[in-house]
UniProtKB/Swiss-Prot annotation:
The modification Phosphoserine is found at S144. Pfam families: Aida_C2 (PF14186), Aida_N (PF08910). Acts as a ventralizing factor during embryogenesis. Inhibits axin-mediated JNK activation by binding axin and disrupting axin homodimerization. This in turn antagonizes a Wnt/beta-catenin-independent dorsalization pathway activated by AXIN/JNK-signaling. This is Axin interactor, dorsalization-associated protein. It comes from Homo sapiens (Human). It comes from the Eukaryota. The gene is AIDA. Widely expressed in adult tissues, with highest expression in the heart and skeletal muscle.
């Protein structure tokens, strides 16, 4: 084993243990961050070209499967469902496999597949990988978007059953104003509801790719059904909208900007909300406007009450 590989395995092992420790202590935000960042590192190695990797194709496949399991555990921690799909004790079975990846030759304990090449960055990772976005955006529109793999369709959820005296909210995402709207490849919006600590209160939903782009607008015209009755949302909660697009040069999906709506803004009719610079600040502590130009996210709210 080369010194480079030994050091790499030690870093992976330390990251794995940190995530599992946070998980067992109930520090879910920290655990999710650690799991997602490690998953991206494993994913990168699993997808490395043969001559750029010290691992065999079979070992890279196993590394990719471990990345998938980290994603599954991260998703389970963010889920509002009581039944976790992928448990901590399941994840812990993978630590010795990762540690001994060079000699591991048994069947993988879980029926999963390596995550696909196109990826979404973990919180905090974008700052390390991206430089000034404006400098790059000039070339982002070069080439046809059709030459890249099609993104998975949106993950929109149906409206919840109505309950007497309870209010449901439908948010129509109409359009978003951006100075370089026409250059965005496969743009979509991730919608989540977070408490003041950035913890998910409902399942996260992705819109399908935008219906059309023109000048300074990306049009969606899609309805989001809030997956919780308005009265059941905790004090200080907010609905977040993260605008994401594919960056072919770097082969990942990046958050360009975000917006959010607080509980006192929930009222029927149209609303426009300001756009903020990434990374997404779910705790709303250090907000920076994306631009001084009059560009916003345009929404329309409909309340349903029995």
């Amino acid at each position: 084993m080369s010194e480079v590989t030994r050091s790499l395995l030690q870093r992976w092992g330390a990251s794995f243990r940190r995530g599992a420790d946070f998980d067992s202590w109930g520090q879910l935000v920290e655990a999710i961050d650690e799991y997602q960042i490690l998953a991206r590192h494993l994913q990168k190695e699993a997808q490395a070209q043969h001559n750029n990797s010290e691992f065999t194709e079979e070992q890279k496949k196993t590394i990719g499967k471990i990345a998938t399991c980290l994603e599954l555990r991260s998703a389970a921690l963010q889920s509002t469902q009581s039944q976790e799909e992928f448990k901590l004790e399941d994840l812990k079975k993978l630590e010795p496999i990762l540690k001994n990846i060079l000699t591991y030759n048994k069947e993988f304990p879980f029926d999963v597949q390596p995550v696909p090449l196109r990826r979404i960055l973990a919180p905090g990772e974008e700052e390390n990988l991206e430089f000034e976005e404006d400098e790059e955006e000039g070339g982002a529109g070069a080439g046809s978007p059709d030459s890249f793999p099609a993104r998975v369709p949106g993950t929109l959820l149906p409206r919840l059953p109505s309950e007497p005296g309870m209010t449901l909210l439908t948010i129509r995402i109409e359009k978003i104003g951006l100075k370089d709207a026409g250059q965005c490849i496969d743009p979509y919006i991730t919608v989540s509801v977070k408490d003041l600590n950035g913890i998910d209160l409902t399942p996260v939903q992705d819109t399908p790719v935008a219906s059309r782009k023109e000048d300074t607008y990306v049009h969606f015209n899609v309805d989001i059904e809030l997956q919780k009755h308005v009265e059941k949302l905790t004090k200080g909660a907010a609905i977040f909208f993260e605008f994401k697009h594919y960056k072919p040069k770097k082969r990942f999906t990046s958050t360009k900007c975000f917006a959010f709506m607080e509980m006192d803004e929930i009222k029927p009719g149209p609303i426009v909300i300001e756009l903020y610079k990434k990374p997404t600040d779910f705790k709303r502590k250090k907000l920076q406007l994306l631009t001084k130009k009059p560009l916003y996210l345009h929404l329309h709210q409909t309340l349903h009450k029995e």
